Amino acid sequence: MKKILSLLTLVLTVATYGQVITPEDDGLIPKSDIHYSNTRVVPYPFLRQDDMMWSTRHWERIHVQEKLNHPLYYPVVPLPDRKSMFDVIKDAILTEGTIQEVYRDDRFELFLTPTEVYQILVRVDTLRDPDDPSIILAVDSIELKSPNVISWEIKSDWYFDKQRGEMKSRIIGISPVVKDPQTSEIYNIFWIWFPDARQALATNIAYNPDNNVKRLTFDQILQMRYFNAVVFKEENVYDRMIQDYKQNRPMEQLLESKRIREELRDYEHGLWQF
Protein backbone atom coordinates (compact mmCIF):
# COMPACT_ATOMS: atom_id res chain seq x y z
CA MET A 1 0.00 0.00 0.00
CA LYS A 2 2.85 2.35 0.89
CA LYS A 3 4.49 1.60 -2.46
CA ILE A 4 1.29 2.47 -4.31
CA LEU A 5 0.91 5.76 -2.44
CA SER A 6 4.55 6.62 -3.10
CA LEU A 7 4.10 5.88 -6.80
CA LEU A 8 0.98 8.06 -7.02
CA THR A 9 2.78 10.90 -5.25
CA LEU A 10 5.66 10.65 -7.73
CA VAL A 11 3.30 10.67 -10.72
CA LEU A 12 1.42 13.72 -9.44
CA THR A 13 4.68 15.54 -8.76
CA VAL A 14 5.97 14.86 -12.27
CA ALA A 15 2.63 15.95 -13.77
CA THR A 16 2.69 19.18 -11.78
CA TYR A 17 6.20 20.16 -12.75
CA GLY A 18 5.95 18.67 -16.22
CA GLN A 19 3.77 21.49 -17.52
CA VAL A 20 5.91 23.35 -20.04
CA ILE A 21 4.99 26.96 -20.78
CA THR A 22 6.63 28.77 -23.69
CA PRO A 23 6.61 32.43 -24.78
CA GLU A 24 4.18 31.48 -27.54
CA ASP A 25 1.60 30.52 -24.89
CA ASP A 26 1.57 34.13 -23.60
CA GLY A 27 -0.05 33.19 -20.29
CA LEU A 28 -0.14 30.96 -17.24
CA ILE A 29 -1.57 27.95 -19.05
CA PRO A 30 -0.34 26.40 -22.32
CA LYS A 31 -2.61 27.26 -25.22
CA SER A 32 -2.92 23.56 -25.95
CA ASP A 33 -4.72 23.17 -22.61
CA ILE A 34 -7.13 26.07 -23.17
CA HIS A 35 -10.32 24.87 -24.80
CA TYR A 36 -11.09 27.88 -26.95
CA SER A 37 -11.97 25.98 -30.10
CA ASN A 38 -15.53 24.88 -30.64
CA THR A 39 -16.41 22.34 -33.31
CA ARG A 40 -20.19 22.41 -33.35
CA VAL A 41 -23.18 24.70 -33.14
CA VAL A 42 -25.69 24.18 -30.35
CA PRO A 43 -28.94 23.38 -32.18
CA TYR A 44 -32.09 25.36 -31.59
CA PRO A 45 -34.68 23.71 -29.34
CA PHE A 46 -37.39 21.93 -31.28
CA LEU A 47 -40.37 24.21 -31.83
CA ARG A 48 -43.77 23.05 -33.00
CA GLN A 49 -46.06 25.48 -34.77
CA ASP A 50 -48.87 24.55 -32.37
CA ASP A 51 -46.69 25.56 -29.39
CA MET A 52 -45.93 29.01 -30.82
CA MET A 53 -49.06 30.80 -29.66
CA TRP A 54 -47.88 34.35 -30.47
CA SER A 55 -45.05 36.05 -32.35
CA THR A 56 -43.83 39.41 -33.63
CA ARG A 57 -40.84 40.58 -35.63
CA HIS A 58 -38.33 43.26 -34.63
CA TRP A 59 -35.44 44.99 -36.35
CA GLU A 60 -32.82 46.21 -33.88
CA ARG A 61 -29.64 48.27 -34.11
CA ILE A 62 -26.56 47.47 -32.01
CA HIS A 63 -24.34 50.55 -31.69
CA VAL A 64 -20.74 49.40 -31.30
CA GLN A 65 -19.76 52.61 -29.47
CA GLU A 66 -21.64 51.44 -26.39
CA LYS A 67 -19.43 49.78 -23.80
CA LEU A 68 -21.55 46.63 -23.52
CA ASN A 69 -21.27 46.14 -27.28
CA HIS A 70 -17.49 46.52 -27.50
CA PRO A 71 -16.87 42.72 -27.71
CA LEU A 72 -18.67 42.77 -31.08
CA TYR A 73 -16.41 45.55 -32.38
CA TYR A 74 -12.91 45.05 -31.00
CA PRO A 75 -10.17 44.27 -31.85
CA VAL A 76 -10.19 46.40 -34.98
CA VAL A 77 -6.83 44.81 -35.86
CA PRO A 78 -6.87 40.98 -35.62
CA LEU A 79 -4.97 39.42 -32.70
CA PRO A 80 -3.40 35.93 -32.62
CA ASP A 81 -6.28 34.48 -30.58
CA ARG A 82 -9.28 36.55 -31.64
CA LYS A 83 -10.65 39.07 -34.13
CA SER A 84 -13.67 41.29 -34.53
CA MET A 85 -17.05 39.92 -35.58
CA PHE A 86 -16.77 41.82 -38.87
CA ASP A 87 -13.45 40.12 -39.68
CA VAL A 88 -14.90 36.74 -38.69
CA ILE A 89 -17.82 37.17 -41.08
CA LYS A 90 -15.70 38.65 -43.87
CA ASP A 91 -13.18 35.78 -43.71
CA ALA A 92 -15.99 33.22 -43.54
CA ILE A 93 -17.47 34.62 -46.76
CA LEU A 94 -14.35 35.37 -48.80
CA THR A 95 -11.74 32.89 -47.54
CA GLU A 96 -13.26 29.96 -45.67
CA GLY A 97 -16.54 29.67 -47.56
CA THR A 98 -18.49 28.72 -44.43
CA ILE A 99 -21.00 31.55 -44.97
CA GLN A 100 -22.80 31.37 -48.30
CA GLU A 101 -26.24 32.86 -47.69
CA VAL A 102 -25.45 36.55 -48.27
CA TYR A 103 -28.02 38.98 -49.66
CA ARG A 104 -28.43 42.65 -50.51
CA ASP A 105 -31.50 43.26 -48.35
CA ASP A 106 -33.27 41.94 -45.28
CA ARG A 107 -35.85 40.11 -47.37
CA PHE A 108 -33.14 37.69 -48.55
CA GLU A 109 -34.18 37.97 -52.18
CA LEU A 110 -31.09 39.30 -54.00
CA PHE A 111 -28.28 36.78 -53.56
CA LEU A 112 -24.64 37.90 -53.50
CA THR A 113 -21.72 35.76 -54.60
CA PRO A 114 -18.32 36.00 -52.83
CA THR A 115 -17.01 37.95 -55.82
CA GLU A 116 -19.82 40.48 -55.51
CA VAL A 117 -19.22 40.76 -51.76
CA TYR A 118 -15.52 41.44 -52.42
CA GLN A 119 -16.43 44.17 -54.92
CA ILE A 120 -18.62 45.79 -52.27
CA LEU A 121 -15.89 45.64 -49.62
CA VAL A 122 -13.07 46.77 -51.90
CA ARG A 123 -13.89 49.66 -54.21
CA VAL A 124 -11.46 50.86 -56.86
CA ASP A 125 -11.57 54.52 -57.92
CA THR A 126 -9.77 55.47 -61.10
CA LEU A 127 -8.62 59.03 -61.79
CA ARG A 128 -8.39 59.71 -65.53
CA ASP A 129 -6.87 62.55 -67.47
CA PRO A 130 -9.65 65.08 -68.27
CA ASP A 131 -8.08 65.80 -71.66
CA ASP A 132 -7.50 62.15 -72.56
CA PRO A 133 -9.77 59.69 -70.67
CA SER A 134 -7.71 56.76 -71.94
CA ILE A 135 -4.84 57.89 -69.70
CA ILE A 136 -5.14 56.73 -66.09
CA LEU A 137 -3.49 59.13 -63.68
CA ALA A 138 -4.05 57.21 -60.45
CA VAL A 139 -5.84 54.18 -59.04
CA ASP A 140 -7.13 54.40 -55.49
CA SER A 141 -8.33 51.29 -53.63
CA ILE A 142 -10.81 51.86 -50.79
CA GLU A 143 -11.49 48.91 -48.50
CA LEU A 144 -14.15 48.67 -45.83
CA LYS A 145 -12.60 47.36 -42.60
CA SER A 146 -13.57 46.82 -38.97
CA PRO A 147 -13.01 50.46 -37.91
CA ASN A 148 -15.62 51.53 -40.48
CA VAL A 149 -18.38 49.49 -38.79
CA ILE A 150 -20.56 51.76 -36.65
CA SER A 151 -23.39 49.35 -35.83
CA TRP A 152 -24.97 45.97 -36.48
CA GLU A 153 -28.59 45.45 -37.44
CA ILE A 154 -30.41 42.26 -36.55
CA LYS A 155 -33.76 40.95 -37.68
CA SER A 156 -35.35 38.63 -35.13
CA ASP A 157 -38.62 36.92 -34.31
CA TRP A 158 -39.99 37.03 -30.77
CA TYR A 159 -42.41 34.27 -29.85
CA PHE A 160 -44.09 32.75 -26.82
CA ASP A 161 -43.57 29.01 -26.48
CA LYS A 162 -46.53 27.68 -24.52
CA GLN A 163 -44.89 24.25 -24.19
CA ARG A 164 -41.95 25.73 -22.25
CA GLY A 165 -43.89 28.71 -20.92
CA GLU A 166 -41.38 31.37 -21.96
CA MET A 167 -40.80 34.25 -24.33
CA LYS A 168 -37.90 33.63 -26.69
CA SER A 169 -36.23 35.36 -29.61
CA ARG A 170 -34.56 33.87 -32.63
CA ILE A 171 -32.29 35.90 -34.91
CA ILE A 172 -33.19 35.63 -38.59
CA GLY A 173 -30.63 37.94 -40.18
CA ILE A 174 -27.68 40.15 -39.34
CA SER A 175 -26.09 43.06 -41.20
CA PRO A 176 -23.02 45.28 -40.66
CA VAL A 177 -23.63 49.02 -41.03
CA VAL A 178 -20.63 51.08 -42.07
CA LYS A 179 -19.64 54.69 -42.55
CA ASP A 180 -17.94 55.08 -45.90
CA PRO A 181 -14.37 56.39 -45.36
CA GLN A 182 -14.56 58.45 -48.54
CA THR A 183 -18.11 59.80 -48.72
CA SER A 184 -19.16 59.46 -45.03
CA GLU A 185 -22.34 57.76 -46.25
CA ILE A 186 -23.90 55.31 -43.77
CA TYR A 187 -25.36 52.13 -45.23
CA ASN A 188 -25.80 48.36 -44.83
CA ILE A 189 -23.14 46.36 -46.65
CA PHE A 190 -25.19 43.16 -46.94
CA TRP A 191 -27.56 40.91 -45.00
CA ILE A 192 -26.66 37.41 -43.86
CA TRP A 193 -29.12 34.60 -43.20
CA PHE A 194 -28.15 34.09 -39.56
CA PRO A 195 -28.53 30.28 -39.30
CA ASP A 196 -25.91 30.00 -42.06
CA ALA A 197 -23.48 32.20 -40.09
CA ARG A 198 -23.72 30.33 -36.78
CA GLN A 199 -20.93 27.86 -37.60
CA ALA A 200 -18.42 30.67 -38.16
CA LEU A 201 -19.63 32.67 -35.16
CA ALA A 202 -19.61 29.63 -32.87
CA THR A 203 -16.00 28.77 -33.70
CA ASN A 204 -14.55 32.21 -32.97
CA ILE A 205 -14.17 33.69 -29.51
CA ALA A 206 -14.90 37.22 -28.32
CA TYR A 207 -13.56 39.09 -25.34
CA ASN A 208 -15.41 38.45 -22.08
CA PRO A 209 -15.13 41.60 -19.91
CA ASP A 210 -16.43 39.74 -16.84
CA ASN A 211 -14.05 36.77 -16.86
CA ASN A 212 -11.14 36.30 -19.25
CA VAL A 213 -10.93 32.58 -18.43
CA LYS A 214 -14.51 31.88 -19.54
CA ARG A 215 -14.37 32.97 -23.14
CA LEU A 216 -17.59 33.44 -25.09
CA THR A 217 -18.14 32.86 -28.78
CA PHE A 218 -19.92 35.41 -30.95
CA ASP A 219 -22.79 32.98 -31.35
CA GLN A 220 -23.20 32.76 -27.57
CA ILE A 221 -23.17 36.55 -27.21
CA LEU A 222 -25.91 36.95 -29.80
CA GLN A 223 -28.02 34.00 -28.64
CA MET A 224 -27.87 35.13 -24.98
CA ARG A 225 -28.49 38.73 -26.11
CA TYR A 226 -25.41 39.90 -24.25
CA PHE A 227 -25.64 43.30 -25.93
CA ASN A 228 -27.69 46.47 -25.90
CA ALA A 229 -29.85 47.28 -28.91
CA VAL A 230 -32.46 49.80 -30.01
CA VAL A 231 -35.58 48.74 -31.90
CA PHE A 232 -35.89 50.77 -35.10
CA LYS A 233 -38.72 48.82 -36.69
CA GLU A 234 -41.55 46.56 -35.61
CA GLU A 235 -43.53 44.44 -38.03
CA ASN A 236 -46.56 46.50 -39.08
CA VAL A 237 -49.18 46.74 -41.79
CA TYR A 238 -47.49 49.77 -43.40
CA ASP A 239 -43.99 48.25 -43.33
CA ARG A 240 -42.68 51.49 -41.81
CA MET A 241 -39.67 52.11 -39.64
CA ILE A 242 -39.98 54.22 -36.51
CA GLN A 243 -38.16 57.10 -38.18
CA ASP A 244 -40.82 57.15 -40.90
CA TYR A 245 -43.58 58.23 -38.52
CA LYS A 246 -41.35 59.99 -35.98
CA GLN A 247 -39.38 62.07 -38.42
CA ASN A 248 -36.67 64.43 -37.13
CA ARG A 249 -37.61 63.58 -33.55
CA PRO A 250 -34.79 61.42 -32.17
CA MET A 251 -36.02 61.55 -28.58
CA GLU A 252 -39.48 60.36 -29.58
CA GLN A 253 -37.89 57.60 -31.65
CA LEU A 254 -36.06 56.34 -28.56
CA LEU A 255 -39.25 56.52 -26.51
CA GLU A 256 -41.11 54.58 -29.21
CA SER A 257 -38.39 51.93 -29.18
CA LYS A 258 -38.72 51.70 -25.40
CA ARG A 259 -42.51 51.43 -25.70
CA ILE A 260 -42.20 48.49 -28.10
CA ARG A 261 -39.88 46.69 -25.70
CA GLU A 262 -42.15 47.33 -22.73
CA GLU A 263 -45.14 46.12 -24.73
CA LEU A 264 -43.28 42.87 -25.36
CA ARG A 265 -42.48 42.49 -21.66
CA ASP A 266 -46.02 43.38 -20.59
CA TYR A 267 -47.47 40.79 -22.95
CA GLU A 268 -45.37 38.06 -21.34
CA HIS A 269 -46.23 39.23 -17.82
CA GLY A 270 -49.91 39.37 -18.71
CA LEU A 271 -49.91 35.68 -19.57
CA TRP A 272 -49.01 34.82 -15.98
CA GLN A 273 -51.62 36.99 -14.28
CA PHE A 274 -54.67 35.25 -12.86
Predicted regions located by residue number:
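Residues that flank catalytic or metal-binding motifs in active/ligand-binding sites
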Residues: 148-150, 170, 188
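Short linear, low-complexity motifs centered on an aromatic residue
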Residues: 183-196
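A domain-level signal for the mature, folded cores of soluble proteins
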Residues: 19-163, 194-274
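Bacterial Sec-dependent N-terminal signal peptides
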Residues: 1-26
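Extended serine/threonine-enriched, polar tracts that run as long, contiguous segments within proteins
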Residues: 166, 171-186
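Short conserved micro-motifs at the rims of enzyme active sites and ligand-binding pockets
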Residues: 10, 17, 165, 185, ...
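Assembly/interface hotspot detector across virion components, adhesins/toxins, and nucleic-acid enzymes
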Residues: 3, 126, 175-177
